[in-house]
């Protein structure tokens, strides 16, 4: 129950998965993973299938995990989240590391054209959905 409290879902302890939103299901998955007391957590696009309103719920839990010192490897297109939470950002293309470094450097002043192109397209998509 403590782990459900940690992810803000103690009130849903008796709920079935079909009764939970996508964001709530993701937070339950995080609680289940935390039950194993991991030293490291892997997230592969944890918000990609969520409605935009629910993305914040999951990112808030992940932000709290980071603040508590959890080591996380996160594959994401949530660039602002990465900028705020990550110690290191790695940009990959076709399985190859193109650029890595501090978030401010990689996301704010990328050195490689492929990184620049990706970030420009991503910003354009967010501005003109």
Regions found by a protein language model. Name each.
Residues 1-94, 98-103:
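ABC family nucleotide-binding domain
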Residues 104-129:
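C-terminal boundary and immediately downstream tail of ABC-type ATPase nucleotide-binding domains
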């Amino acid at each position: 129950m403590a782990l459900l409290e940690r992810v803000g879902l103690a009130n849903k302890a008796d709920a079935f998965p079909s009764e939970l939103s996508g964001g709530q299901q993701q937070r339950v998955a995080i609680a289940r993973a935390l039950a194993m007391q991991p030293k490291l957590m892997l997230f592969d696009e944890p918000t990609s299938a969520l409605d935009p309103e629910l993305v914040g719920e999951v990112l808030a839990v992940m932000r709290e995990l980071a603040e508590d010192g959890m080591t996380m490897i996160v594959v994401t297109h949530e660039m602002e989240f990465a900028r705020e939470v990550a110690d290191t950002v790695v940009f990959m293309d076709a399985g190859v590391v193109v650029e890595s470094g501090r978030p401010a450097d990689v996301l704010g002043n990328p050195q490689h054209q492929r990184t620049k192109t990706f970030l420009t397209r991503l910003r354009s998509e967010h501005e003109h959905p």
